[in-house]
Amino acid sequence: MSNPPLYFAGLDIGGTTVKSVLVDGEGDPVGETVEVPSLVKKGCEATFGQLEAALDQLTGAAGIRRDQIAGVGLDVPAPSSEGVIWAQANLGPDWVGTNVRDRFSDRIGGVPVYMTNDGNAAALGEYAVRKKHFGSLLLVAP
């Protein structure tokens, strides 16, 4: 019996919404993107619940099980290091000092979570799409 295919989720925590996408092992989108309220001002636990809701909607729409998600890419609108938020930025005060990466990974059954800030995520995404045409990329955001 062959192993079921694995998928990866991308979750973008914004000031008002969480935007999410599911991709296959080749990086091709599977199903539709999902957007839910982020609830960042209500605290990180409220947002973790919204992230899980987005994952459930993504997997349900694609007809896959959550245990088929091999990894999650998570971006946050704040500076962080090693998964720990170190400045409030667009988040509520309870985010500062929180290891978002590890806590969210624990909530979703130990699935690896790879986290960066939203600016780095935007640059990495643009580079991934355009690297066939350009050798370098400079991203300037307002």
Map each language-model feature to its residues:
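Short glycine-rich, Thr/Ser-proximal phosphate-binding strand/loop in the N-terminal lobe
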Residues: 2-49, 53, 85-87
